[in-house]
C-alpha cells in the first residue's frame, strides 16, 4: 500500500498510512510477510513480531515441458529471442520500462496481461505483442515459451510472476528491491537491476539475449531455485505458525530474523 502511494504521488499520506498499518498489525500475535524486504519494511515502520512466510509455486503447472513451438513462432517468426512480461498493466507495475527492451536488436517482446494502461502501452510499444489476459494452460505455455522474463515494477512485496517464470525454466531480470531479492540470484538464475540506474534493466536483458552461455547457465538454474517451494511445504509452514500462536509462543517471534 505504501509503495502504491509513492507511485500515485500520494507521498504526503505515507506516514499516516504506515501508522494505520502498524496499528492494525500490532493487534495480532504475529504478522506474516512474504519477503525479507517486506519484513524489514514493516519492522522499520513500527510493526512488531514480523516473520517471513514466502509463497509457493505449482511446479507442475509451471514447467519447461509446456514450451510450445507453435506459440514461439507466433511470438517471433524471425527467430528472435523472446522476452516476456506477465502482469497487470497498471501504473505501479511501471511496464513502460519495456520500451528500451523492445528496441534491442534480435528481441521480440511479449506482454501478457490487461489493465488500465494497456491502450497507452500499445501506443508506446507498437512492436510488442500484447496478448491480453491469459490463464490456465495458455499461461503455462506462454511462460515456458519465453527465453527471458523481464520484470519492471520496483514495489513488489513478493512477485509471484517471477516464481512462475523460474519454475518454467526461464531466467529472470528483475529489480534489486522488494520481493525479487529473495527470488533472483544475480548471475545464477537471472540478473538484478538497480532501480536507481534505469539503464541496468535493459543491460541485464541484453546480457541474456546476446550471451548464449549466460542464458543457458541461468536457464539451467531457474527451475531448481524454486521447485522445492511447493504449496504443500509452505502451507505446512503456515500451520506451524498457527500452532505456535495457539500455544502462546508469539513472544518467540519478536525480533525473529527469518
Describe each region flagged by the PLM:
Residues 11-67, 77, 130:
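Donor nucleotide-sugar binding/catalytic pocket of nucleotide-sugar-dependent glycosyltransferases
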Residues 76-106:
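Conserved donor-binding/catalytic core segment of Leloir-type glycosyltransferases
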Residues 133-134, 141-146, 238:
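Short alpha-helical donor nucleotide-sugar binding micro-motif in glycosyltransferases
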Residues 154:
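Aromatic "clamp/platform" in nucleotide-sugar-dependent glycosyltransferases that forms part
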Residues 171-174:
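Short hydrophobic beta-strand element within catalytic cores of glycosyltransferases
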Residues 186-187, 191-198, 207-212:
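Conserved acidic donor-binding segment of nucleotide-sugar-dependent glycosyltransferases
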